[in-house]
C-alpha cells in the first residue's frame, strides 16, 4: 500500500513540477539576438537595434536623439541578457524536478528502477521542446513566440505519457518485489 501511495505521489509531484509558470506578458513578437543586432519581428513590424543604439523600423533607418539612443541601447542590452536568463531558468526548473523525482525513485524503488530511464527521457524531451521556444544558434538565439502554445500542449502530452509509463513501471516493480518476498 505504501508503494502505491508513492506511485500516486510521484505522479502528482511530477505534474506539479511541470505546472506552467504564468507570465503576465503575452509575447507577440519573435526576438532574434545576434552579435550585430537585436531584431524584434512580429505583428507590428520589424525593429532592428544595433548595440550602439541605431534603430531601423520596417527597413527605414531612424535618427534618434541622445535619450532615445540610450533607450534603444538599454532595450537591446536587456533582451540580450534576459532571454538567456529565461532559457536557463526554465531548463533549471525541469532539471531540479527531475533530480527530486529521481531521488525519490532511487530511495523507494532502487537504482535499477526502469522509472529512472523514463524520467531521464522525459527531461530530455521537455528540454528539447523548450529549445523550440528559445533556440540557441551559433550566432546568438531566437525567441519564437508562436511556438509557446504548441510546446505547452506537446509538453503536457509528453508528461502525461511519461507518467502513465512510470505508473505502470511502479506497479510492475512493486509486484515483482512482492513476489520475491513471498
Residue ranges of model-derived segments:
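Terminal leader/tail segments of proteins
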Residues: 18-182
Amino acid at each position: 500500500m505504501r508503494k502505491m501511495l508513492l506511485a500516486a505521489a510521484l505522479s502528482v509531484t511530477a505534474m506539479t513540477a511541470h505546472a506552467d509558470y504564468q507570465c503576465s506578458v503575452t509575447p507577440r513578437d519573435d526576438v532574434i539576438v545576434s552579435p550585430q543586432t537585436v531584431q524584434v519581428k512580429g505583428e507590428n513590424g520589424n525593429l532592428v537595434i544595433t548595440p550602439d543604439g541605431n534603430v531601423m523600423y520596417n527597413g527605414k533607418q531612424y535618427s534618434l536623439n541622445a535619450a532615445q539612443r540610450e533607450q534603444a541601447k538599454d532595450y537591446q542590452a536587456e533582451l540580450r541578457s534576459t532571454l538567456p536568463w529565461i532559457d536557463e531558468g526554465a531548463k533549471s526548473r525541469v532539471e531540479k524536478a527531475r533530480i527530486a523525482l529521481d531521488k525519490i525513485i532511487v530511495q523507494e524503488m532502487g537504482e535499477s528502477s526502469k522509472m529512472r530511464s523514463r524520467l531521464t527521457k522525459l527531461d530530455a524531451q521537455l528540454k528539447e521542446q523548450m529549445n523550440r521556444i528559445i533556440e540557441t544558434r551559433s550566432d546568438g538565439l531566437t525567441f519564437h513566440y508562436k511556438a509557446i502554445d504548441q510546446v505547452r500542449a506537446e509538453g503536457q502530452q509528453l508528461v502525461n505519457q511519461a507518467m502513465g509509463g512510470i505508473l505502470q513501471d511502479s506497479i510492475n516493480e512493486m509486484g515483482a518485489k512482492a513476489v520475491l518476498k513471498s
